[in-house]
Amino acid sequence: MGEKEIVDGCVAACHIAYACSEVAFTYPITPSSTISEVADSWMSRGRRNIFDQVVSVVEMQSEMGSAGALHGSLSVGCSTTTFTASQGLLLMIPNMYKIAGELWPCVFHVTARAIATSSLSIFGDHNDIMAARQTGWAFLGAMTVQEVMDLALVSHVSTFECSVPFVNFFDGFRTSHELQKIDMISYETIKKIFPYEKLKEFRERALNPTHPTLRGTATSSDVYFQLAEARNKYYESTPDIVQSVMDRLAKLIGRSYHLFDYYGHPDAEFLIVVMGSGGLTIEEMIDYLMEKSNEKVGMIKVRLFRPWSIDAFVKKIPKTTKRITVLERCKESGSLGEPLCLDVSTSIMRSELSSNNILVLGGRYGLASKEFTPGMALAVWENMISENPINNFSVGIDDDVTFKSLFVRQPRLDLLTSETKQCLFWGLGSDGTVSANKNAIKIIGESTDLQVQGYFAYDAKKAGGATMSHLRFGPKPIKSAYLLQRCDYVAVHHPSYVHKFDVLENIKQGGCFVLNCPWSTLEELNHELPSKIKHQIASRDVKFYVIDAQRIAQESNLGRRINNILMVVFFSLTNIIPLDLAIKLVKEAIKKTYGKKGDAVVNSNWKAVDLTLESLIQISYDKSQWISKDKCGEKSLPATAVETGNKDQEITKSTVLKQKPEHDVNQFVKDILGPVNALKGDELPVSMFEPTGTVPLGTTAYEKRGIAMSIPIVDMNKCTQCNYCSIVCPHAAIRPFLLDEAEFKNAPETMHIPKAKGGQEFSSYYYRIQVTPLDCTGCELCVHACPDDALHMEGLQKMEAVEKTHWDYLIGLPNKAEKFDRTTVKGSQFQQPLLEFSAACEGCGETPYVKLLTQLFGERMVIANATGCSSIWGASYPSVPYTKNQKGYGPAWGNSLFEDNAEYGLGMVVGYRQRRDRFRELVSNEILKDITEEEEFLKDDNASVQGRNEIITKYDHLKDYLRSWLKNIRNGEACQSLFEEISKLLEDNLINSNNFAQVLKKDRIELLEKLYDSRDLIPKISHWIVGGDGWAYDIGYAGLDHVLSFGEDVNIIILDTEVYSNTGGQASKSTPFGAIAKFAQSGNLRQKKDIGSIAMEYGSVYVASVALGANYSQTIKSLLEAEKYPGTSLIVAYSTCIEHGYTKYNLQQESVKLAVESGYWPLYRYNPELVRTEVVDNLTTIVSSGFTLDSKKVKVDIENFLKRENRFLQLIRSNPELASMAKDKLKAHSDKRFQKMKDMSENVTVTALKDQIKKLKDQLISIQNASKTGELAASGLINADLFIEQEMHVLYGTETGNSEEVAQYIQSQLVSRGYSSSSLNLDDLDIDEFLNPDKFSTVIIVTSTSGQGEFPGSSGILYEALLKKHLENQDDKFCSFMRFGIFGLGDSNYVFFNEAAKKWDKLLLDCGAVRIGAVGMGDDQSEEKYETELIEWLPDYLQLINAPEPKHDEKSEIPKATTFKVTILDSCRNDILNESTGTLCEKLDENNNIGNSHYKPIIPPNSVLLPVIENKRITNQDYDKDVRHIVFKLIGDGGDTPSLSYCLGDSLALYGQNPVNEAIKAIEMFGYNPYSLLRLSINEENEANNTNKVNQRYSSLFGYDITVLQLFVECLDLWGKPNRKFFQEFYRYCSNPEEKIQAKKWAQNEGKKLIEEFSSKTGTYLDVFKMFESARPTLAQLLDIVPFIKSRSYSIASCNKFVNGEKIELCVGIVDWKLESGEIRYGQCTGFLNRLPILDSESKIDSIPRLPSNIKASAFNLPFDYRSPVIMACMGTGIAPFRAFVQNKKYIRDVLKEEIGPVILYFGCRYYDNDYLYREELENYVKEGVITSLNIAFSRDPKGYKTSNCENIRYAQKMYVQHLMLENSQEIYENMIEKCGYFYLCGTKQVPIDIRKAIIQIIIKHSSTTEQVTSEEDANSILNSIQIMGRYNVEAWS
């Protein structure tokens, strides 16, 4: 007998395989991976085999590779083995035929596993074995862990003795992963039986040139057959040889085996034949039946399945046998029976038993490790003895479709005695429970004489799923190969499980129950525990204990690892071994398990062990009270079909396969998801399942696992709305939400929802970041990604209720994604993630990429997903995280295999393209074929059809859509939009009505029906092939390489975790040098495959390397470019993984950044479309390589990255010398690669050529500039000292990529002017490099601002270094050599507007640098965002540095290709001015009818038409300022529903119109007919177009017919002020050469003066065209250079509640001025308002004006407390919002009956008599006590002109508001500072500056001495803090 050890089946097999082999070729596949890992571990530790040699364990790229390499190794005489399962075995079949054909001795160790069919399963059955049974290999099967070892040795010996290769197989998981105490076979014993002589013979057959032979010939039909038959004798002799080996082994080890072993009654009448672990359960059942009633039942265990020995089998059958049942763990569809059953039947038929009339029955059990319990075994026997037994039955399921399943009478039959203790542990995936229980088994088994068994069940979730550890201990051998039926001890390690699972279902009477939870008192437990649990505890006299293991783990610095704590609890309560000894052994196990992770981890675990017992609490419960608890009020699982359905339904109906299965998600959740997640899936009947395995999307949203201990909680006061938390969230569990006014008002009161920040598109929304508490995993990534510390973690139980209420409300709101640019970091996160709540590990690095893909392209994605982590978290039945959007669109997902995913995805692309090509032919050749006469497609009797013209128009629109589709067939966004339009049009007129059928001929209708049926081919599918590095670098690489070479339009993303994550962390060819992984446990000593460089070699593949955690914008940019690229694209995505072993897992983003900054993971993009070449002297040189290195500098030493991850630290601890060498090699490799990429990025291959050209240019430019500088200096325009060198670099700091884009644009402008320029990330420079005067004497800095005045992620390091140097050398102006310009990107809604740019400016000036020009202040609140300022700032800067003019060529002289296409139609429409309304209308014909095309006003996106019911002047008629009070009626389509809702401080954005008569003149000037109809569309001929960038204002016109007059009146801003960008393009349109020369001057540096002079005269776009008569662009060209009319926003002067939501009131000043010519001109919008009729309540007109309008949200923050003081200051029409504020206060006081605080108003006017607006109303509010203090400053009235009789009303003359505030400073200070009031200001741009100065003076004056506010700086700091809190609010206008 050998030594006893506790091992699982994998280790048992490995022990023999390692001993008897010289080489093992491996590839990881579950569940065989453990064998490979153990062998690799032994190899790394130097363990030797029986040949006294360390086995060479070689990991291959696939199972195909392993089999091929193994075949080669055998061919040269090397004893070789491998380990595999399932698909892996199938991949080896071709080589298995070859090996068997050549009679090579060999053993495959196979952990038998299910084969993927309609779904994948990693669990055990015999389908893979049966699929390979025909290959000519011998198959030897084991039932127990002991048998695995013994029969493995039989296999290895037999294969040499009979020259037939063997498969040694055993059940996957049930045997492979079951822990048992077994007798090990020593190497000495193995050597005694090993056939060394046969080994010698084998080696003599090896291929060797000293005795050469040849194998593997190609044969013809004349000899092939004979060769096949020549091997017969080997197979005929094999059974006897195997039996001989078994007999010899028995003498050595004392355990006897036979080809077939019998067990049972010697005179059995009923016999069961079985193979594998199921036989153990049959044994228990036989013992039970024989003991109970001496039943004559027996069993034959099949050992040698192939070659099958009839004689050996028949000899084991008792002569008394009447019936035989063959149990099979496989299914062979379409066969008469499964393979074993056929073998048994054939054996009986061919033997002497054929005349005995033995009935042979076949049945299936245990597929994919389905449980096979004693109760099921009993059901098999009961079926066999029944009068009418079922043949081809199934057992263990409920087959209510074909009704072949057996009824299990005793499902909980437990055949174990009380001697065997059974313990069940419910753990949370990755919490360490399983590993702790493995240690516990080993401790018990090694320190006692008890037999042990351990089996561990998991769900398919990567982490956070349920784990069930089934442990048995007893004095006798444990045969029970099934889960626990009755438990002595139950431990539940996560408190949520008591609500989810029936955890005490199997607990015995008097059992022990341990619950890990934060509830420690009986009161808490009474409240928290479900009634059912309490009833079970009391009714079974359960001893109940609780412990808060999470608290202990946190105190011990263990995070969430509670395993060892609860193991100590187990030992303390079970008394299996003395407690002191147990704790000692536990600590030793901890040292052994965690030693590689360092002493700190070990010590933390030891501390937790020591704290455990004092924290264990036994609960004394009131048994009578608890036992009376019933299940009332409990959440129960929904009834399943087996409980409610009818089993007598006709089979034919249930077996019909639908072509397009429709899934009711709710029904699926009810019938399948709920029961499966409650671990009741075994009870589901067959009828519940869709035959093809198709499942509905979005089922994870129903799970609500609640596994996080703590969740992120947002402080919206700190949140800067960057959305970073959302983009990093692996589970889409935290998201940004936008709410409109109505949604905001209906939101839960507990939810803080501030105004949305950003550009104008956000202006009408509120914003909230929200977590879904029950879907969050608590990884904390969002907390660490937040730049503003706006997130912190709180306990789930504390926050669940309120946060769930918030989430439920927000998730039910309409998604507003369509209104935002999904191509930005922020905008992408407003898109619904179509991957949510997956079962990936907490902090998973893969899911954020796929989630982001779904946000960018999800509604049109098709995904081919390789097997691996991404297929498991992405599609583990029935949990599907992929979901659909509100329109029902979402990713379509498929999985084939591990190895063929690239080919699978390619097939999708080719197949879809083929179908789409046919569809395109249908559209172009049939539906749109040229038809000149309407009669050819119209019915003869169509004239009388009502609405005929309208129907024909719709049909014409359909054809227009289809034409547009043909032109945009490769444009994803356009096709998606057209798909929706076409589908709707067809549904409205073909499917849901007979409109088209009334008018169109039958053949047309049939074509349209075909079109509708195939409409899903309209979208341009975004094809994505998704997989991990194991697939891409190894097993699937050949296929991947083929797809890369193929050139199809398909996108590939490799989620590169650098190990085989799914199978447990084995090394792949992606594993980095020096990392420790399984199969590389001594450190991986080969460099990682550079798959990106390999792909780039094709020259036709788009390639990008990305790391989301390091650079969000680069990742998004890469994904967008890849998807747009018209060919194959490859994204290599750095994906963090728990296998990396982060020292602090929640800080993994920092590790990602270090990976990039150290050069370990470079970020780059290669776009073949950007490759440019030039031919110089017949030599083709690369001008642009198409390669962009986005991580432009190595910033930190690679060691900083390596030391954060345990995969590298393990090597440092175990072998410091090797680790040091590995680090040096990895660094050298990374540096070399970085330099190569830098060279590629800079095109150094043509450096010499460029240098020569540059020198010549420089000489010429220097001559030119010397002249120009002199001229400019002489003229005084520029100081000669400021002349700039011809090298100028643009440095940027960016967070989202916008600053980088601006920098690149500026760089391109510099390059076009002859400068040598580059754009560099600020932090890519170190300080010494930055202070190099030879390179950076002139720079432009472009930077955004992050958070509350912080630097963006890529610019803080250099700034801090420069600041430090300055502080150390304040008198040293070390930057005096530098000239700089600076441009900031910011949002004026933020307090620290452009703060980063201001800080850079101040620091550089302090260091002696000289700024050129002003600081550019880009503002997201401007109409064109930062571009508004940029197009003014950059030309000014270029003029100041005397930059040369851009180089001009022929292309620069002609107009560019237009963005739009304008089609002038043949028909016209007579639009005219409606004198009553001042707007356009359609003229009726002589019969008062309108034509076919109706006039409809153009309504900009997100706008509505509001009727004007009042427009009256409220200033004196003789006063020069015309101020209007304008009222809009809020009546929607419903008659009395407001069509717009607004709140305090909001503005109404109005779209003005141009004067009709002037527009007609302008149209005629451009040569068009004002009344011609036109149609606007994208110009498909302009390939540079990107429809994603097309403004909604333009795209909203697509598909509509408008007149040229309507375009000029309602769209083109021809009467607006031209910007600099216009002049830069305008000269191209001048056909007269002289005019072109003159116009070009306006585009050059000197043009600024011309433009300023022109603007001073308020020139318009139209004026420019009048000046240059030859410039007559087409309408399409006009659309490119003349913008659309912009909205003008006016503060709303009414309170919505005060006016009952019935109207909007404005106070608008009409803007007008007189030109030198005497012409009166008006502001664009106010001029339009001025042209409207004067209206009041008495006005009587036929129709009223309706104006396009929308709401723009206010930046004002309103107080939550009505009693907070409110101080308001305004000038002129700035009174508007404050009038609304005062109305609101009156409403609160008079209607809501709430107390209000002080209301103080400071109002600046010119004259009391002329412009004291709303005087009577305001002073009445004072008298009513609403306004506390009214203060009016009249700047033009003489002093003393008017006085007030009311003490609360103050008049002051000859002063401005700020002066009046200073006079009343005490009032201001008391209410604003002391009482924490809110201050509001509304006025022109200069006013906020003056007011702020006044308040600062007030703070200084009234602050107490203890506050030490003695300077403006201190006071300003106080005011800044008030502003950050939202209590200082400014709205200013120019």
Swiss-Prot record:
Query: Family, per the entry?
Result: In the N-terminal section; belongs to the pyruvate:ferredoxin/flavodoxin oxidoreductase family.
Which sites bind [4Fe-4S] cluster 1?
719, 722, 725, 729
Provide this UniProt record's keywords sorted from A to Z.
4Fe-4S, Electron transport, FAD, Flavoprotein, FMN, Iron, Iron-sulfur, Metal-binding, NADP, Oxidoreductase, Repeat, Thiamine pyrophosphate, Transport
**For this protein, what reaction is catalysed?**
pyruvate + NADP(+) + CoA = acetyl-CoA + CO2 + NADPH
* Other information: Arose from gene fusion of pyruvate:ferredoxin oxidoreductase and cytochrome-P450 reductase. Gene fusion has only been found in Euglena and Cryptosporidium.
List residues of the FAD-binding FR-type domain: 1501-1759
Which EC class, in a word?
A: oxidoreductase
Cross-referenced SMART domains = EKR
> Which positions in this protein are listed as binding [4Fe-4S] cluster 2?
776, 779, 782, 786
Q: How is the cofactor bound?
A: Binds 1 FAD per subunit. Binds 1 FMN per subunit.
Give the E.C. number(s): 1.2.1.51
Protein name per its UniProtKB record: Pyruvate dehydrogenase [NADP(+)]
SUPFAM superfamilies xref list: 4Fe-4S ferredoxins (SSF54862), Ferredoxin reductase-like, C-terminal NADP-linked domain (SSF52343), Flavoproteins (SSF52218), Pyruvate-ferredoxin oxidoreductase, PFOR, domain III (SSF53323), Riboflavin synthase domain-like (SSF63380), Thiamin diphosphate-binding fold (THDP-binding) (SSF52518), TK C-terminal domain-like (SSF52922)
Tell me the domain of life: Eukaryota
What the entry lists under CDD domains is as follows: CyPoR_like (cd06207), TPP_PFOR_PNO (cd03377), TPP_PYR_PFOR_IOR-alpha_like (cd07034)
An example of a Gene Ontology BP annotation on this entry? cellular respiration
Flavodoxin-like domain sequence ranges: 1288-1438
Q: Where does FAD bind?
A: 1542-1553, 1685-1695
Molecular function terms from GO: 4 iron, 4 sulfur cluster binding; FMN binding; iron ion binding; oxidoreductase activity; pyruvate dehydrogenase (NADP+) activity; thiamine pyrophosphate binding
Domain 4Fe-4S ferredoxin-type span(s) in chain numbering: 710-739, 767-796
Q: Name one GO cellular component term.
A: mitochondrion
Which NCBIfam families does the record associate with it? pyruv_ox_red
